[in-house]
């Protein structure tokens, strides 16, 4: 195993914690949930502590977000950020149930490596 991507604490370098968020769209709101998630990308791109972020579609009305952070502080900043605030404002209109937000710990990961400029 290449241990260069593993930190001293045994977790993947650069990533130690994450969030898995499940979103169930109200009937007829599926497209709006998709649009909301796509529009969230620029907001997340402005968060330096969000190492990776994915908007997901599990099925016709089932969506999610998976994101990872270097540490708990980065995760807390994200949870207090603009995407979380926007989701809080729109959840009652867009979602059939409250979002399920599950904190997760990263056991292993493969992230893109920075390439040297030629």
Q: Predicted segment positions?
A:
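Intrinsically disordered, low-complexity acidic/polar segments
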Residues: 30-32, 74, 110
